[in-house]
Amino acid sequence: MGSPEGEEAVVATAAVVEDGLRGNGDGGGGGVGEVVGVGRSIDMEWRKAEEAAIRRYEAANWLRRVVGVVCGKDLAEEPSEEEFRLGLRNGIVLCNALNKVQPGSVPKVVEAPSDSADGAALCAYQYFENVRNFLMGLQDLGLPTFEASDLEKGGKGVRVVDCVLSLRSFSESKQVGRSAPLKYGGILKPSMSGKHFIRKNSEPFVKTMVRSYSAELLRDGVSLEQSLGLDFSLEHVERTTPDSIRMLVQTMLSDKKPEEIPSLVESLLSRVIHEFERRTANQNESVKHALDPNDDKLLSRADTPPEMESTCTCSTGNMDEEDHTSVSMKEEVSTAVLVNGENVVEHIQAKQTDKYFDQQQKHIKDLKSNLATMKSGMEHIKLQYSEDLDKLGKHVHTLSHAASGYHKVLEENRKLYNQIQDLRGNIRVYCRVRPFLPGKVSSSSSVAGLEDRTITVMTPSKHGKDARKSFTFNRVFGPLATQEQVFADMQPLIRSVLDGYNVCIFAYGQTGSGKTFTMSGPKVLTEEGLGVNYRALNDLFNIQAQRKDTFCYEISVQMIEIYNEQVRDLLQNETVDIKNSSQKGIAVPDANIVPVTSTSDVIDLMNLGQKNRAVCSTAMNDRSSRSHSCLTVHVQGRDLTSRTVLRGCMHLVDLAGSERVDKSEVVGDRLKEAQHINKSLAALGDVIASLAQKNAHVPYRNSKLTQLLQDSLGGQAKTLMFVHIAPEPDAIGESISTLKFAERVATVELGAAKSNKEGGEVKELKEQIACLKAALAKKDGETESIRSTQSSPDIYRMRMGSAPPAFRNPMEEVGNLETRSNGTPRQKKRNFELPDVENDTSSWLDTSSQKEAALGEWVNNSQFGSSNSLLELGPDATQDVVFYQRNSPEPQWSWAGSVATEDSDDFEVTTSCSSEQDMVRPTSAPKAPGSANGSASIARKAQPKGAKSTDIRSTNPAKRAAPLQKKINGPPSASTKNGKQLSLSAADGKRAPNGKVSAKK
């Protein structure tokens, strides 16, 4: 393009560019350019204002987050330009923000008074000091700054906003740890913005690269020529065109948004091409008109553009040469434009690609470095974690070992503690705190603290301060304790029933404290809500099934209530009486006893009992129990191997709650019920107090309740009291009274409980005794004739010591006697009536054959001819026969003479649970009425045949006696006292007022 024609074409191109730029920037030009220019001018002004406001809001919000409130003032979220300038005018906000981003950048910030109004000017020194320090800090960081005058009215607030946003960008880059150079002066936009690269498929990649790169350079204030190093063949343009063209381009593009620059460049290029096409077409038209002979030359010159006049004038000679010249010039212009455009695109693409690759390489290096650092860090952390885990594992192992040892020791301590409790016979006391009722949850509770065995309650103080008092029991359960947890702690106590022990568990507390819930459960039974009654019987059934190969158990239940001092059977709804001396330890024998074999049977019986129980609604409890309920479980077990019989009894008592009449608001029958309840509970308190003080007299009979619990509280059972308290603050008085009573109960020592166990041999011997008693009753009638024929001299002679001596051996076991065979033969004593001895003294000298015949007759009559016979005589027992022989042609043996007397050790018979004195009586007895005055003794009359045998009042094996074979041994000793021998009737004989002996009924 060194020819004059090429230079002129370039000049024309520059002119078109200048016209296009001026048309876009100033609104000049005609046609479509003017319309587009005006529309874009209006739109640009609006966009610029909106962008400035958005950037100002962003700067203000960032300052609000970083600095906060300064001098009691705060920047608005969306400040105007004036508000923004006034807020930053004193420089305090700017200095504080800079110190937040880069600590220590401004060593001293001059603070303004807190009461200064907005916009109030500081002194010149303060103003200059803060702003100068801020600008110096920005310069040290390499950030763009502004002039101090920009903070004054009429200053350029845009530069202040750009400065704040650049500081924000620096802060963000510092937080994320970016090391790449950043560009400041507005919102931080990465050089490879994804927004520019996400284009439509129809837009070439080259245009995208050009637009992105051009937008960044123009935002940084760098000219297109300086950035690209290209001149677009502008060397010729600079020689022929003024510098205002370049300034115009820079001015127009510097105020545009990055996204608007590509469209502006496209519009400029399209106008240049359009202008070239238009001028080329005009030139062709001019040439055609010039070749037309009819046209005037002046007209042709007028229509020809000025740039082509010289060409047309110089080519008047040869029209083909002119046409060739114009065509070649058009091609050269088009080629120059295309070549320059391609070179620009290629250069931009190459430079952008190189820059992109450099950045990517740098990023890759940074990533590799970071990856290596992270790997080494992870290895170090992994090693450290491994060491820490090893240490932690060893520590956990040590703790688990210590914890297992602690739990083991704790369990051993608990077992030892329970053993001590069993030996001492203390009443176990458990405490349970009821949770707040639904809908009555209170923010405050009277319970201040709960531990395993200690409860602390808040007590009202006289000085207005809450005092605390602690109580210690065997176990304390909080409001969150479940029914299963409560039962698990008392389960060993309940299971001891199967071992033959008596157990008593009773719930105590004020009304509405949860006693019935603990013992029976909620109104609607669920598996989780089953109370102690159901769980205890279910546990007994399970153990019964487990021991079915070794033990045979029979379980039966009673259910009674004490209502207004009347004992009622809940299973029959009848009134019954309490008999503490009844058989087999049953306190209420008249109550219905129902055998049970499964939990369903128990549930049916409990439902029936609860249905018949007296329950009423009061102001304190909608389901208040108006009576004391007692579920008694009787267990009788038999060892299949040793035939040992075990008997156990368990009382599960749900006491009615104590209540205050003013709170329960009861009247009429309810008031009477409350009075009886409080009276019986007071009697229980008196019994506990007497037991705690170890008084000789304990007032059990003051109430039906204490009379029912006499066996349990008197030392014959393992006893547990379950106290219940309510957590409401208004019930603190009743709670403290309940806890004090429970604390006193815990000090009571009842002694070790005894197991109700009897061996198989003892049971058989008792059965034999019962049979002997029955036979004795039948033979009592036959002794009447023998007693009437006895003479009084025989009685006198027997009392004076002429009777054969008798011997007593020490008692080794109650009911178990043995006869020794080493020594002098011993005569067995028999009970003889005084008339029998007096009438016939020759009976002392009967022969051995007569004795054997009489003995055989006795065996036949008593129906005990088997090996179980009570009398077994050895070969050397001839003297015994002489002692028992009667002098009669047909001797008759009295049954009373074949049974041991109370003075003899041959046979002893127990008749009641309190008959130890009956089994072995003193050797002294009242004298016969006839012996005092020397007259003949009065003949005794025997008991009629129809007399019944004595009832057995107790089945306690320790209280029973059974006959065993006894051998003869030892030296003779007289069984006389004061020279007079005693004469008693049968074991159960009782002297009548007339001197006769009759069987005890």
UniProtKB/Swiss-Prot annotation:
Similarity section: Belongs to the TRAFAC class myosin-kinesin ATPase superfamily. Kinesin family. KIN-14 subfamily.
Residue intervals of the Calponin-homology (CH) domain: 53-172
Biased composition (Polar residues): 972-984
InterPro entries from the UniProt entry: CH_dom, CH_dom_sf, Kinesin-like_fam, Kinesin_motor_dom, Kinesin_motor_dom_sf, P-loop_NTPase
Domain Kinesin motor positions: 426-748
Superkingdom, natural source: Eukaryota
Gene Ontology molecular function: any one: microtubule binding
Positions with a binding annotation for ATP: G509, Q510, T511, G512, S513, G514, K515, T516
Region (Disordered): 284-322, 804-830, 890-1001
Gene3D superfamilies: Calponin-like domain (1.10.418.10), Kinesin motor domain (3.40.850.10)
Coiled-coil annotated residue ranges, if any: 756-784
Signal peptide range in chain numbering: none
Protein name according to UniProt: Kinesin-like protein KIN-14P
Designated gene of the protein: KIN14P
Biological process according to GO: microtubule-based movement; microtubule-based process
Cellular component terms per the entry's GO annotation: microtubule; microtubule cytoskeleton
Bias-annotated ranges (Basic and acidic residues): 284-300
Presence of the UniProt keyword Plastid in the record: no
KW RNA-binding (keyword) present: no
Keywords: ATP-binding, Coiled coil, Microtubule, Motor protein, Nucleotide-binding
